[in-house]
A protein has these predicted regions:
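Residue(s) in the substrate-gating loop at a strand-loop-helix junction
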Residues: 66
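Conserved hydrophobic beta-strands of the Rossmann-like cofactor-binding core
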Residues: 9-10
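Conserved mid-core segment of classical short-chain dehydrogenase/reductases
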Residues: 16-32, 75
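C-terminal helical subdomain
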Residues: 104-105, 116-156
Length: 171
């Protein structure tokens, strides 16, 4: 009731531990934090606000997943799994909701605090916003950003090649 005029919900929070299950410092607590932050919390937030969104015109939910939801990398299996969960949840939610538009942003590596010291070829947050804004205005609900467009094509042509590309990514 406090947010009765809310018409857009953006789920952008995320954490990623760049570790494998074999790393002794990758604890059950870290795993639970990753799942809670990346998957459970957005679902709970949507559930708690769905009636408000349904009652307002031009309502939208924007979930941010990751290119790693499409093709995972060797490290960060739990992160990849949570983002794949957001990907499928967004698609399913789109089927359920007629009055609320459900968008999914599927970005590559973005230059943020979370990715500091990781990877090359990051895109700026502004580039992500610009690409998403175009998609939002055109009601394109599954928004592959920058390199993810190419990753999708490669994965469709040969998932083995996509897997090899991602397996080589260590950051």
């Amino acid at each position: 009731q406090e947010h009765k005029d809310l018409n857009v919900l953006i789920n952008n929070a995320g954490i990623q531990y760049d570790q494998t299950l074999l790393d002794e410092t990758y604890t059950l607590q870290k795993i639970e934090n990753e799942i809670s932050t990346n998957l459970t919390s957005p679902i709970k937030l949507i559930t708690s606000l769905i009636s408000v969104l349904q009652n307002n015109s031009n309502s939208a939910i924007v979930n941010v997943s990751s290119g790693l939801a499409i093709v995972p990398k060797a490290k960060s299996a739990v992160y990849c799994a949570t983002k794949a969960g957001i990907h499928i949840f967004s698609k399913s939610l789109r089927y359920q909701l007629e009055k609320v538009k459900v968008f999914e942003i599927i970005p590559p590596l973005v230059d943020t605090e979370m990715t500091k010291g990781r990877g090359k070829g990051k895109i700026s947050p502004q580039r992500l916003v610009d690409e998403f804004t175009k998609a939002y205005k055109n009601n394109r609900y599954e928004v592959n950003i920058h390199k993810v467009k190419l990753l999708r094509i490669i994965n469709r042509i040969s998932s083995k090649i996509a897997d090899r590309i991602m397996k080589g990514i260590t950051v």
